[in-house]
Amino acid sequence: MLELRPTCEHCNKTLPSDSLEARICTYEYTFCVTCVDSVLGNVCPNCGGGFVPRPIRPSKNWKGDNFLGKDPPSTKIKHRPVDPAAHAKFSAPIKNIPPQKR
């Protein structure tokens, strides 16, 4: 189950569980759409994968206790700003490869 991390790991922007700006990679590293587009170039600095919009967990118990009340979002902040120079070097050989082919 997704943790639904509360902030962008680069800029520390608040990303509530219903945020349309949250992006995650397959390992759930979480960034805001602005950082994904303008800083990371859709290359995760931790795994090299791409990003997708983070799903929004239902706020109501529509079925089977699968909702925020039963499984609340994480409150643990993971603020690890990316070094732009190091990321540029890391992402250079893979940034032009589509995420589904990385």
Regions found by a protein language model. Give the residues of each.
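Intrinsically disordered, low-complexity regulatory regions in eukaryotic proteins
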Residues: 1-102
